[in-house]
């Protein structure tokens, strides 16, 4: 697949997650649902331009430029905790978008969203299980994900 195919596929996954979570939030009378749906339509647009386009997905490229492109993306997009300085400062709207992004990535890579929340993100963004931010993340991921089938 080409770089553009992978990027568009990821954005489609995130947009679909934002639509689903947004509709569920609207059903709960939460006004951020509509804004989350809107964000799904502009998610990761910065990846189409400049250093992000040139260096985010080029495995043969200069690692220093790839690192710079990742940093640029993270501090330029409010669905990344780095934009806010800390995950604890993220408004709920962008925390919801982050959860939608994480769920898309987990699906694309065949990994566990729950493991990312409990281990990967907890370590990267320095939060503890059962902290206030963890509980918010779990609430939004619980709204996004369908419940598993009950055993017969």
Question: Where do the PLM segments sit?
Answer:
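Metal-dependent phosphohydrolase cores
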Residues: 1-152
């Amino acid at each position: 697949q080409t770089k553009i195919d992978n990027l568009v596929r990821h954005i489609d996954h995130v947009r679909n997650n934002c639509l689903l979570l947004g509709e569920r939030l609207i059903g709960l009378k939460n006004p951020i649902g509509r804004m989350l749906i809107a964000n799904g339509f502009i998610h990761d647009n910065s990846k189409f331009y400049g250093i992000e386009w040139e260096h985010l997905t080029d495995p043969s490229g200069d690692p220093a430029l790839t690192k710079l492109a990742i940093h640029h993306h993270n501090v330029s997009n409010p669905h990344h905790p780095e934009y806010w300085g800390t995950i604890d400062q993220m408004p709920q709207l962008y925390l919801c978008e982050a959860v939608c992004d994480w769920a898309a990535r987990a699906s694309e890579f065949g990994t566990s969203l729950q493991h990312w929340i409990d281990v990967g993100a907890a370590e990267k963004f320095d939060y503890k299980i059962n902290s206030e931010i963890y509980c918010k993340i779990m609430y939004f991921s619980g709204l996004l994900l369908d419940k598993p089938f009950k055993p017969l």
